[in-house]
């Protein structure tokens, strides 16, 4: 664990670093798809972790999606995530986390979604992270374009060596 990591974040220290892997997406309004992904958690000696995420197409490496944000722990067991997406969406998610040995589980739901006028209508988002040693699995749920909240993305990433 980094010696300069804020004490509130120590339970989440295993997130720090780069994670790479593959994911799959689906939604009623689009064709199912697969993607390559890299997620990076880092810190700036402040009471939050920084988060960046980039995906690209498996077939040609073309960029697909990107987000960046901040994750903080307002009190033990509780977590907040502020994100900006490349697709004209900003979101605030709140939730809980638990740590059992090497296993960290995080569950988040949106409290606020901001959209620019030309963005697709996204009405709800939720995330579940499961970190077990050097494996980071997640799922994302989305409600958008008239569809209810439902499964959208699932991925398994591994710590980049």
From Swiss-Prot:
**Cofactor: binding comment:** Binds 1 heme b group per subunit, that coordinates a highly solvent-exposed Fe(III) atom.
Q: Can you state which reaction this protein catalyses?
A: peroxynitrite = nitrate
**Member of which family?**
Belongs to the nitrobindin family.
Which PANTHER family does this chain map to? PEROXYNITRITE ISOMERASE THAP4, THAP4 PROTEIN
Q: Is Transcription regulation among the key words of this record?
A: no
Name of the protein described by the UniProt record: Peroxynitrite isomerase
Q: Where is this motif: GXWXGXG?
A: 17-23
Can you state the subunit structure given in the record? Homodimer.
Please give one Gene Ontology molecular function term for this protein: heme binding
Cofactor(s) required for function per UniProt = heme b
State the domain notes.
Answer: Forms a 10-stranded antiparallel beta-barrel structure able to accommodate a hydrophobic ligand in its interior. In fact, this fold hosts the heme group, which is located in a wide surface cleft.
The protein's role, per its UniProt record: Heme-binding protein able to scavenge peroxynitrite and to protect free L-tyrosine against peroxynitrite-mediated nitration, by acting as a peroxynitrite isomerase that converts peroxynitrite to nitrate. Therefore, this protein likely plays a role in peroxynitrite sensing and in the detoxification of reactive nitrogen and oxygen species (RNS and ROS, respectively). Is able to bind nitric oxide (NO) in vitro, but may act as a sensor of peroxynitrite levels in vivo.
Q: In which pathway does it act?
A: Nitrogen metabolism
Please list every transmembrane segment annotated in the UniProt record, as residue ranges.
none
Residue runs in coiled coils: none
Pfam short name (any one)? THAP4_heme-bd
Query: Which Enzyme Commission number(s) are on file for it?
Result: 5.99.-.-
For binding heme b, which residues are annotated in this chain's numbering? 152
Task: Note the InterPro entries from the entry.
Answer: Calycin, Nb(III)_bact/plant, Nitrobindin, PeroxynitIsom, THAP4-like_heme-bd
Instruction: For this UniProt record, give its keywords in alphabetical order, as a comma-separated list.
Output: Heme, Iron, Isomerase, Metal-binding
**Source organism:** Mycobacterium leprae (strain TN)
Key word Flavoprotein present: no
